[in-house]
Each structure stands twice: as structure tokens, then as C-alpha cells.
Amino acid sequence: MDILLALLPAIAWGNILLVSVKMGGGAYSQTVGMTIGALFFATIMYVFTQPALTMTILIVGFISGLFWALGQVNQLKTVEKLGVSTTVTISTGMQLVATSIFGVIAFREWTTTTTIILGTIAILLIVVGVVFTSLDDKENAQPPGQLKKGLLTLIVSTFGYLVYVIIIRWYNIDGWSAILPQAVGMFVGAVVLTSKHKPFNKYAIRNALSGLLWGTGNLFLLLSLPRVGVATSFPLSQTGIVISTFGAIVFLGEKKTKRQLIFIALGSVLIIGGAVLLGMTKA
């Protein structure tokens, strides 16, 4: 039962991009819509849990949310260039590598020979997985420069997600306390980043559903952490890439050749394998 609970964040987060694309709209209205849903969810959660909110929690949580908005809007812009199935695997891989390297440098996470070996193998697996999932095929090649533009946009996205995660940990703020300030920062950040593109339309309202999914995934992660621990919950939460990747191919009709499907499957397995090894370094 506890493992099932730990899998629920992956199910929720794995469906976010699928729902966003299905709801329609561009990256800007999708991002604003997600933050509307997330803010609504966070407000409800705060009413029921009422964690203590110090000035540090309010400021740091707000800043964290701003950077989440930077990460999300650029991830969705990449989806427009590369599609969900390619974007989500590369993005997940980049985030895992970035947070792991920063964790080693800033928090001295890998302090034993075993964790150094496991962590190094994990990063290599993830990097190879990212390369596999981004391979083009002559029959289904991206337009010239499209992959490069997408990767550059994902680097900005990864930076946003990295700060979103790291700043909360740097100030040792627990997830329950951070939810509401983060959601406020997410909404404000989304509005600031998208205001020139008139994001408030029917698609923004529709995409509130994806924001509710984000909040639901967050809730289940917080509930599962004390039950199964970080070493188990962390890699399980990353398995959502399987849902996103193959859901995009099956339900969104993204076209892939047989060769691409094989490499996407292998890449996804390698990235999840890397996430499992990273989870072991946190045990």
C-alpha cells in the first residue's frame, strides 16, 4: 500500500503535460492556467494543514515559485518545438543531473566511496538516456536547428527547476510549509513572464486542471516520504516519464519511427535506472 502511495506522484505528474496539450493553448496560457490550479489547491491545503509561516518561509517559498514558473514556461515552449515525448525525457534527465551535481557540491551528499560510484554511474546512465531519447531519424527528422533551440530552451527550464528545488532545501523548509508561498510565487512568476502574450483566455482556465494534478502529486509525495523514505519515493516519482513519453505517442498521436521508439524506450529505462541509483545514494 505504501509503494502504491509513492507511485501516485508519478501518475499525477506524468499526466501534467498530456493534460496541458489536450486542454489546448500555447505555452503562456498553459503556464498561467497551471498556476491558477496550483494556487487553488495550495490554498485548500493550507486551510486544512495550517503550517506555521515565518517571514523566511514566505520569502524563500515565493522565490522558489518564481523560478518554477521560469522552468515550466520554458518546458512548455520546448514541447511546442520537440513534442511531449522528447521534451519530458530530456527535461527529466537534465533535472536529475543538475540537482545531483549541485547536491554534491553544495550539500556534500556523496561522502562515501559507494555513493560516489553509484552517483557517477547514475549520471552516466541518465546522460546516455537523454542522448537516446533525442536521437533523430532520417524518416522523421526535426527541422534544421529545431533540436538545438529546444535544448537551449530546456537548459533555461532546468535552471529554473534547479533553483526552485535547491533554495527550499538550502533554507531547510519542509514541503507542507512551502506549498502556499510557492504557489503564490508560481502564479506571480507566470503572470510576469507571460503578460506580453495575453495568457488569460479560455485555455488558461482549462489548464487549471493540470495545476490541480501538480498539487495532487505534491501532496502524495509529502504523504509518502515519511512512509517509504527518500531513497524509495524519489526514484518512484521519476517513473512518470513513462506515462508522459508513451502517453504522448499513444494519446497525442506524436509520430515516431520504429527506431526512435526503441531508443526512447531504452532512454526512458536508463533515466529511471539512473534515478533508482540516485535514490540509493540518498538512503
Swiss-Prot record:
Location in or out of the cell: Cell membrane
GO molecular function: carbohydrate transmembrane transporter activity
Chief place where the protein resides: membrane
Signal peptide (residue range): none
Membrane-crossing residue ranges in chain numbering: 4-21, 26-48, 52-71, 84-106, 110-132, 151-173, 178-195, 208-230, 234-253, 260-279
Record InterPro entries: Sugar_transport (IPR010651)
Membrane topology of this protein: Multi-pass membrane protein
Keywords: Cell membrane, Membrane, Sugar transport, Transmembrane, Transmembrane helix, Transport
Cellular component per GO, a single term: plasma membrane
Family, similarity comment: Belongs to the GRP transporter (TC 2.A.7.5) family.
Designated name of the protein: Putative sugar uptake protein BC_0219
Organism: Bacillus cereus (strain ATCC 14579 / DSM 31 / CCUG 7414 / JCM 2152 / NBRC 15305 / NCIMB 9373 / NCTC 2599 / NRRL B-3711)
Lineage: Bacteria, Bacillati, Bacillota, Bacilli, Bacillales
